[in-house]
Every structure is written in structure tokens, then in C-alpha cells.
Regions:
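C-terminal ends of transmembrane helices
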Residues: 14-20, 43, 90-103, 150, ...
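Extended hydrophobic alpha-helices typical of membrane-associated regions
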Residues: 198-258
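Membrane-embedded alpha-helical segments that form the functional core of polytopic membrane enzymes
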Residues: 1-20, 82-90, 132-152
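Helix-coil boundary and interhelical linker segments in multi-pass alpha-helical membrane proteins
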Residues: 1-5, 67-83, 120-140, 191-206, ...
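Intramembrane alpha-helical segments
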Residues: 41-130
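Multi-pass membrane catalytic core of lipid/isoprenoid biosynthesis enzymes
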Residues: 32-75, 170-202, 241-247
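Small-residue-rich segments of transmembrane alpha-helices in multi-pass membrane proteins
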Residues: 110-124, 171-175, 238-251
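Acidic (Asp/Glu-rich) catalytic motifs at the cytosolic membrane interface
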Residues: 9-35, 148-170
Length: 261
């Protein structure tokens, strides 16, 4: 439970930090084509509901909860959580904060995939007391599907992002290129899981995670069909989020079932 709470708080901190830097760059203010609530930021700052300063203070407050909480959890479980958590927080900060601003260098999707892979690895390490190869391997397919969420979300935001120098993959590749990459990442994610089971790295019931494949396929088709009309991508975005959720939950259910069946 403590692991779940800390993961949620860290995720919230990363999102709030991103809101601050998107507000300062003008990316969210100039975004008139976002698909709320999935793209274009929370818009709380742009609507005047909170100030940039208040948002920054919230990010700091969240970090003040995450850091000592993570240290305590590491002392209780495994010291490995220290480097896992430190790397995750560093990447969450570097995603949008200068001078790195990885999201503006076409590295945002990879960064977020790495962060969520670390969540899987860290959560297992807390329960196990050490880092183990199976969750490391398992986290990759999940991270790739998370990357697809960032990728497809960047398509409706591409024009506003480009106007402020935020060179996401959707900006660099264009909508068609993003659609091709989306399909490739979805194929790699599910192929990676199947290959891992075939090589006996993961147990057979991890294949339950392939339940997300039809969702990813449907989203890929919609993205390809509507690449020139990104304002119509809401169903594809919903399917993409659902695919990541189903992938993780179904795989977890399959692994958990091994205890009773």
C-alpha cells in the first residue's frame, strides 16, 4: 500500500512539474487543439484557477512527501529502492525542466517509458527485498505501451508544441510518422512479452497481458485513419490508455493466479 501511495504521489509531482514548465514556455496557453482532459495540460493555470507559483509550491510539497517516504520504504525493504527512486525522480524532473527538457528533444516518450518501468521494478523490489530479472524484463512491455500514450497525445498538441520549440516525436515525425511508430511500439510491446514467455524468462500465465493487443491494434488503426484530423483522436487515445491498463492488470492477474491454480 505504501508503494502504491508513493508511486501516485511521485506521478502527481511529475505532472505538476510539467504543468509549470508548459505554462512558462507558453505551450499550454497556445494550445487550442488539445483534447481535454487527455492532452494540452490540465489548463488550471491558463484558466486562472491557480498561479504558476502555487503550482510550483504544490510540486515542492509533493516532493517533500515522496523523498522521505521513499527513504523510509527503502530502509524497510531494500537499499536498491534508493537508486530506483532517485533515477525515477531525476527522469521525472528532466522530462520537462531545463536545462535537459527531454520532452523537447524527442526523448520524452522514452523517458516516461523508463520511469514507469522503474515503478514496476521498484514495486517488486519492495515485496521481494531485492531486484529480480523477471520484473525487469516484464516492465519493458508495459513501458512501451505507456510511451504510446505520450506519443498519441502529442499528435493533437503538435502545432502548439512546435510553436514553442517543444520538439516531441509527434512534431519531429509528423502525424503519419507517429502513426507508424505507434504501431511499431505496440507490436514490440506484445512481441516482447510473447518472446519472454517463449524463452522461459516469464511464466506462461504472463501471456494474459496479451489481452491488450486488440485495444492497441484498434487504436493504431484509428490513429492511421485520423492522422490528418487529430481533433478526432479521442477514441484512439482512450483505447491507448485502456491498452496500457489492461496489459498491466491482466499480466498481474495471470501471475497472481499461479498462487491458487
Amino acid at each position: 500500500l505504501a508503494t502504491l501511495v508513493l508511486a501516485v504521489l511521485a506521478h502527481a509531482a511529475g505532472n505538476v512539474i510539467n504543468d509549470v514548465h508548459d505554462a512558462q514556455s507558453g505551450a499550454d496557453a497556445g494550445n487550442t487543439s488539445g483534447i481535454f482532459p487527455f492532452t494540452g495540460g490540465t489548463r488550471l493555470i491558463q484558466l486562472g484557477m491557480v498561479s504558476v507559483r502555487q503550482t510550483r509550491d504544490l510540486a515542492r510539497a509533493l516532493m517533500l512527501l515522496v523523498v522521505p517516504g521513499g527513504l523510509a520504504l527503502a530502509l524497510w525493504s531494500t537499499p536498491a529502492l534508493l537508486w530506483i527512486g532517485a533515477l525515477g525522480l531525476l527522469l521525472a524532473w528532466a522530462y520537462s525542466a531545463p536545462p535537459l527538457q527531454l520532452m523537447s528533444r524527442g526523448l520524452g516518450e522514452l523517458t516516461v517509458a523508463a520511469v514507469w518501468s522503474l515503478v514496476v521494478i521498484g514495486a517488486d523490489a519492495v515485496q521481494r527485498g531485492s531486484v529480480f530479472i523477471i520484473p525487469v524484463f516484464t516492465s519493458i512491455s508495459y513501458g512501451l505501451l505507456i510511451a504510446n500514450i505520450l506519443l498519441i497525445n502529442g499528435v493533437p498538441d503538435a502545432n502548439s508544441d512546435a510553436s514553442v520549440g517543444k520538439a516531441t516525436l509527434a512534431v519531429r515525425l509528423g502525424a503519419r510518422g507517429a502513426a507508424w511508430l505507434y504501431a511499431l511500439l505496440a507490436l514490440l510491446a506484445h512481441g516482447w512479452l510473447a518472446w519472454g514467455v517463449w524463452q522461459f524468462i516469464q511464466p506462461e500465465r504472463a501471456l494474459w497481458g496479451l489481452a491488450s493487443a486488440p485495444l492497441s491494434a484498434a487504436a493504431a488503426v484509428l490513429l492511421w485513419q485520423r492522422a490528418s484530423t487529430p481533433e478526432q483522436l479521442r477514441p484512439a487515445i482512450v483505447l491507448t490508455i485502456a491498452a496500457a491498463c489492461v496489459h498491466g492488470l491482466a499480466m498481474a492477474a495471470g501471475l497472481l493466479s499461479m498462487r491458487w491454480m
